[in-house]
């Protein structure tokens, strides 16, 4: 779990720092064969932060298939869809994430993204 938590922390706290994102990717790639939602979420979000939206989508859709969606995970998949040119699929995920009224890393980004879609 330590590698997962550090990778997510780096992706969330230093999204503009290339060396931090590279380290996050190295840490998260060990989860490529995982079937556990938290690990897939981290890997997908790290791909997203690195600008690899196709891989992010593939991994986060695997995460969604586990059925273990949380507001933060909905946000991650929604943002990935938005960056991938799929606003129609992004919107309900982002609406659900924000409407859950549970704080999560990125809630302000989710609200801003919704404003850009509507």
Where are these regions (language model features)?
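Start-of-helix register in tetratricopeptide repeats
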Residues: 1, 38, 72, 106-109
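TPR/TPR-like (Sel1-like) alpha-helical repeat modules
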Residues: 82-105
